[in-house]
Regions:
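NAD(P)-cofactor binding segment of oxidoreductase domains
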Residues: 62-100, 134
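Substrate-positioning beta->alpha
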Residues: 150, 160-163, 169-183
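N-terminal Rossmann-fold NAD(P) dinucleotide-binding loop
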Residues: 14-15
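Conserved N-terminal Rossmann-fold NAD(P)-binding element of oxidoreductases
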Residues: 5-9
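Conserved Rossmann-fold cofactor-binding substructure of NAD(P)-dependent oxidoreductases
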Residues: 43-63
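Conserved Rossmann-fold NAD(P)-dependent oxidoreductase catalytic core, especially the SDR/UDP-sugar
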Residues: 88-125
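Glycine-rich Rossmann-fold phosphate-binding loop(s) that bind the pyrophosphate
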Residues: 10-11, 150
């Protein structure tokens, strides 16, 4: 069964999901800031998701909104603008049937080797974790939505941990959960 998908934040992850779903026959729209080539079968739009006139070019009531943008800067203001304000505006303007919000394990305060699982409290002391948690709550305020807390993505161009390990600079006796970008 085919469905409609809108991707806000069609960077590496968003573009991969968009391409996969388009190849499956779904109707896919993808928005990103930079004017770069997009795989075939995707209705590509370049622009700033913070601008109402850009959002209005996307379909209303899509089956799924995949919300996976990146802030312009690593500041509390930009995180709030990108994850909370833009998500709220997208929810109001696009009225999708379901939202998948790509969050992060930054929502957890445990960062000194503690074991973290789905029962761990999401009470980060860092601004990025607090803002992401606020955005998760906004997303989850509507039934059927989901927040995905990705802990780290590996794959082409994402070699920092591998490079550190090869140089002997990696952390020893440390657990980490990673996901390959193809998955």
């Amino acid at each position: 069964m085919s469905f409609s998908l809108v991707v806000l934040g069609a960077g590496d992850l968003g573009q991969r999901v968009a391409a996969l779903r388009a190849a499956q026959g779904d109707t896919v729209w993808a928005l990103r800031r930079r004017n770069l080539p997009m795989p075939a079968g995707i209705h590509a739009l370049n622009g700033d998701m913070h601008q109402a006139e850009i959002l209005c070019q996307l379909p209303v009531k899509a089956d799924v909104l995949l919300f996976c943008p990146t802030p312009d800067a690593r500041t509390e203001h930009e995180y709030r603008r990108t994850y909370v304000d833009a998500l709220r505006k997208a929810m109001e303007t696009l009225q999708p049937k379901r939202i998948l919000f790509v969050s992060s394990t930054a929502v957890y305060a445990q960062n000194e080797g503690q074991w973290v699982d789905e029962d761990s409290p999401a009470e980060s002391d860092a601004f990025n974790g607090r803002v992401l948690r606020e955005a998760e709550r906004l997303c989850l305020s509507q039934s059927g939505n989901a927040a995905l807390r990705l802990s780290g993505i590996t794959g082409p161009g994402r070699n920092m941990l591998v490079n550190k390990a090869l140089l002997g600079e990696g952390l020893h006796n440390t657990w980490s959960n990673r996901m390959h970008s193809d998955d």
